């Protein structure tokens, strides 16, 4: 299977550059199994589309302002993108510079303080920050939000609220779990009234999510690692939902990635640690019955994942419909409610 199998042409004007004024006003394409027709709805219609006893699983990661700028003591400019906080004022980062920094090198940060290069881990570096607050707290005012590269503007104050889900809690992501951005408190309240249950996992979206697949032969692709936590409470909610014939619905591909990584011996088990799972057609997703997901980049691993879930032909048919109907694409764009193709 090749990366080029997942290419499609997208008019640039359909790439959403900013969120809508109201989170749940985003459009929602309902994609049932073929040959049923697509329907064009809005995210705020979800209470009508779901059933009492359904379980929505959200990713409660919180985005950190992970982009920093500075200069080496030699004078060269440096851009830093934090991949993961390691504790003890240390972080694993990506560094953009004209020359790779060496261990022991010091970066003077534009927002005050400095960072020492402790070493290298593949494409990443480990830095120790010398700043006057705990690193996580310092980043809140010193860091810049790392909007995806296809959003062609600088982040503003509004992005600090809108590029964050309303249920974000566990600090550690460098990108938002974007399907969750569509949910606001009024919608969550209406879903509760409908009898829909909620659960949470944590997956800290890493900088690798911005990296393109660099090989055409997908068997040679090395998937990036991300930290996840699937707790015992969520596992019990899933078990109870299944026992009562409810549906487990993932809010986003990050939730699917976390749940699939926590499957053991035919069932979901509590799990905390790193995942490197790569889901593409041929893999059967067993942990969820439907998912809400945004529209993904051509040739991306996320497009491959949803193709594994609903069938590549069905997904590409849905994307053609979305382009024709002028849906908004990518992180600040619209969403789909996606159901799997029946087996056989």
Give the positions of each predicted feature:
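Surface-exposed, charge/polar-rich loops and edge strands
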Residues: 1-344
């Amino acid at each position: 299977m090749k990366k080029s199998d997942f290419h499609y042409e997208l008019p640039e004007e359909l790439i959403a550059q900013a969120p809508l004024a109201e989170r749940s006003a985003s459009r929602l394409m309902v994609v049932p199994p073929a040959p049923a027709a697509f329907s064009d709805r809005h995210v705020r219609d979800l209470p009508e589309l779901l059933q009492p006893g359904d379980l929505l699983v959200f990713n409660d990661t919180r985005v950190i302002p992970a982009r920093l700028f500075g200069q080496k003591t030699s004078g060269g400019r440096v851009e830093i993108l934090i991949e993961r906080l390691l504790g003890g004022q240390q972080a694993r980062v990506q560094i953009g510079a004209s020359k790779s920094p060496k261990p022991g090198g010091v970066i003077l940060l534009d927002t005050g303080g400095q960072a020492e290069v402790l070493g290298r881990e593949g494409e990443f570096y480990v830095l120790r920050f010398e700043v006057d607050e705990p690193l996580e707290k310092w980043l809140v005012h010193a860091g810049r939000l790392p909007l995806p590269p296809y959003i062609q503007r600088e982040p503003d104050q509004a992005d600090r609220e809108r590029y964050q889900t309303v249920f974000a809690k566990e600090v550690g992501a460098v990108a938002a779990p974007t399907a969750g951005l569509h949910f606001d408190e009024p919608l969550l309240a209406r879903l509760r009234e409908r009898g829909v249950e909620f659960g949470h996992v944590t997956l800290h979206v890493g900088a690798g999510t911005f990296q393109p697949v660099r090989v055409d032969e997908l068997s040679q692709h090395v998937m990036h690692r991300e930290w996840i936590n699937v707790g015992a409470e969520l596992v019990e909610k899933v078990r109870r939902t299944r026992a009562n014939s409810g549906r487990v619905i993932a809010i986003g591909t990050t939730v699917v990635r976390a749940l699939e990584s926590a499957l053991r011996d035919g069932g979901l088990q509590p799990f905390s640690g790193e995942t490197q799972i790569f889901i593409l057609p041929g893999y059967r997703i067993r942990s969820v019955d439907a998912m809400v997901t945004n529209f993904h980049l051509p040739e991306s691993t996320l497009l491959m994942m949803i193709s594994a879930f609903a069938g590549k032909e069905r997904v590409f048919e849905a994307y053609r419909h979305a382009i024709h109907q002028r849906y908004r694409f990518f992180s600040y764009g619209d969403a789909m409610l996606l159901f799997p193709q029946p087996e056989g």
